[in-house]
Design a protein with these regions (language model features):
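Phosphate/NTP-binding elements of NTP-utilizing enzymes
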Residues: 1-213
């Protein structure tokens, strides 16, 4: 893990934090962090888990390129997956059932039917800003998805996305509803003051800027 990832993963894995919203840039490892925490939930805490992605195609690709290699590369998880690499009812493109009885689902977020029937402990959303705002006129993705964790003793909702249009972005809205907002701070190389990084422009005396050649 990288230094900025540790607090995020600690929040994702904590039973005392019910909801985590990660407003991120591209290529920060959100999907890998999410899968690492999910592996912890499945193997150690024995929780049922579910991840939604914007479309069915995204979900199938995620299962093939991220989930299956994660199972292969984590020995304790692979030990719970005797079906790995085989055609088996517990090994499909939408669901993995482990020998400890825990299930993992990976579904597309466009259809309302994908938010029904499942009862899980952990609900996750990857690239929330790319989801439809209203799923077939039944409600927002997080409204529908978080109903799946209402019966859990330790309910958890993890949302993450690169933000899109300010004011209409779902991850921005979700984060703004939280009473707590945390940023990663780094020390100034000149004075040592802890600060979070900002982009500047020609009008501001601060921030990250590009010098013309």
């Amino acid at each position: 893990t990288l230094p900025f990832q540790r607090a995020i993963m600690n929040a994702m894995g904590s039973d005392y934090i019910r909801e985590v919203n990660v407003v991120k840039s591209a290529r920060v490892g959100y999907s890998k962090m999410l899968l690492g925490v999910y592996a912890y939930f499945i193997e150690h805490k024995q929780r049922n888990t579910l991840i939604w992605l914007p479309t069915d195609g995204d979900a199938e690709n995620f299962m093939k390129t991220h989930v299956e290699p994660t199972i292969r590369d984590i020995p304790s998880l692979l030990a719970l997956a005797p079906w790995y690499g085989k055609k088996h009812r517990d090994n499909t493109l939408t669901m993995k059932r482990f020998t400890n009885g825990r299930g993992f689902w990976c579904l597309g977020g466009k259809a309302a039917k994908n938010y029904r029937e499942k009862s899980v402990d952990v609900a996750g959303y990857d690239e929330l800003a790319a989801f439809d705002d209203d799923i077939e006129q039944e409600g927002s993705p997080t409204f529908l998805g978080d109903k799946r964790i209402e019966g859990s003793v330790w309910p958890k909702s993890i949302r993450g996305s690169t933000p899109k249009v300010r004011g209409t972005c779902q991850i921005e809205r979700a984060a703004s509803e939280s009473p707590h907002f945390m940023r990663f701070h780094v020390a100034c190389p000149h004075c040592g003051e802890e600060q979070y990084l900002k982009f500047g422009d020609k009008e501001t005396p601060f921030g990250l800027k590009w010098s013309p050649d």
